[in-house]
Design a protein with these regions (language model features):
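Active-site-proximal, Lys/Arg-enriched surface segment
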Residues: 14
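Acidic/polar-rich alpha-helix caps and helix-coil junctions
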Residues: 1, 6, 18-200
């Protein structure tokens, strides 16, 4: 059993309620994560067990996912947001929001409360919202690293720990860090002596 613990930063991106029985808000928290108070970490920790069907199916292979319709909506929305940022044309903003709202309206608890559409006017705010929505939707599916590369390889720090009581390890990728580049597989280097390994 190999659980992953989502960061507080990620969980804070979801608009959900664990106490309001009439409106749970963003249902992805319930569909994607397992709420476990029995793990040897802090109480009531959200965890993801990909191999047991939480977040992404019952695959024993992490990040072994096909393309989902949600990803296609997000990919197209990203193009529209970037075009809106580049040109300032409101039509691209409208198209981006249409894709984002189409995705989101199917992720919220609408039994007693109608989904409220997002309407963001500022290009930079829309870009930020888009990135957060992609992170909410595609968490633990193997997209994040590639997304960060596409966003310009920003500086990133993560805290790692094995269990309570042990020292934490902080790993940092600097902006534009060479570790954002995958190494060329050894089999490819063996077959072509003219290839040079990526610097890491």
């Amino acid at each position: 059993m190999n659980p992953f613990t989502p960061s507080d930063e990620l969980m804070d991106l979801y608009d959900f309620s664990a106490t309001d029985a009439n409106n749970h808000g963003d249902l992805r928290v319930y569909a994607y994560y397992y709420w476990n108070m029995y793990l040897n970490w802090s109480p009531f920790e959200y965890v993801a067990f990909p191999e047991y069907g939480y977040k992404g199916g019952r695959s024993l292979s992490y990040a072994a996912h096909g393309i989902r319709t949600a990803e296609l909506y997000l990919n197209r929305a990203e193009v529209y947001v970037r075009k809106f940022m580049e040109t300032g044309e409101g039509n691209f903003r409208t198209l981006a929001l249409a894709d984002l709202n189409k995705l989101r309206e199917n992720r919220y608890d609408t039994r007693t409360t109608a989904y409220e559409e997002v309407d963001i006017k500022d290009a930079d705010e829309l870009w930020q919202f888009y990135q957060e929505e992609r992170r909410r939707e595609l968490s633990f599916e193997g997209h994040r690293w590639f997304d960060l590369r596409r966003y310009g390889m920003p500086e990133l720090s993560h805290v790692y720990f094995v269990k309570t009581g042990e020292a934490e390890t902080i790993t940092t990728l600097r902006e534009g860090d060479p570790r954002y580049v995958l190494p060329i597989p050894q089999v490819a280097l063996d077959r072509n002596p003219y290839l040079e390994q990526n610097k890491r």
